[in-house]
Amino acid sequence: MKKRTILWLMLAFFVLVLGACGQKTSQDKSDKTKGMKIVTSFYPVYAMVKEVSGDLNDVRMIQSSSGIHSFEPSANDIAAIYDADVFVYHSHTLESWAGSLDPSLQKSKVKVLEASEGMTLERVPGLEDMQAGEGIDEKTLYDPHTWLDPEKVAEEAQIIADKLSELDSANKDTYQKNAQNFSAKAHDLTKKYQPIFEKANQKTFVTQHTAFSYLAKRFGLNQLGIAGISPDQEPSPRQLTEIQEFVKTYKIKTIFTESNASSKVADTLVRSTGVSLKTLNPLEADPQNDKSYLENLEENLAILAQELK
């Protein structure tokens, strides 16, 4: 872990020096761009920053096509961050590489914003009693998937609006108004689906990993994750047996897989239990459609509501 941190810092230093050498070229490019140049870490953060910024700023993301859990920024990604006015990421809990870059970024012109700063994060299901230390990083004990709960999304959008308002006070009213409009739509989603899930006959759903804990808690549901907090993490044979028994005992009809993860484990359960497969989108990667963030989020709610009714 120390070697990886040192490597990131060395790479960051190299990019910083390279950026200084080409400062005139970067400045010429920035002059043609309206507002601030904002780089974001992955899709949910990008979508929220874009909603709050509207057309005021140039908002981009460095990760778009894969899950954020296994993402490592390339040299070009880091160069893009150092070329930005503002870098926004979700949390140290999720993007540990951002924490490695943070000290050197603080010495540059780039303003670094943690979008979930101040939010209350829940413990990862099953790790509530585990203590940090002896090789266990405290950050890994907390669930970062706040972007799948409409109310948490509204909270994070407001944090982003407040931070951008501090950096760009001339446009504070626009940031705040956009955040309020976005939050109102998020609240409407909660109001729409709360009574639907309250009437649902089935309250438990099985997912490929525990990405939907905040969503489940918000709507009074119970999530059983097949493979823990990461879609790349394989469950043990004992865990698979326990899940098979759970599915049969509670008459689970559907296992929800993810659009950006392997379905090998879920396929094994389908063969052994006879359940069907449906897809929920953890929204870690850009869905590559014309829908708004909240419209993509609502797709998950609609699929769950249909299966649990």
Enumerate the language-model features and the residues they cover.
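Sec-dependent N-terminal signal peptides of Gram-positive bacterial secreted proteins and lipoproteins
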Residues: 2-25
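Extracytoplasmic metal-acquisition and chelation regions
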Residues: 20-309
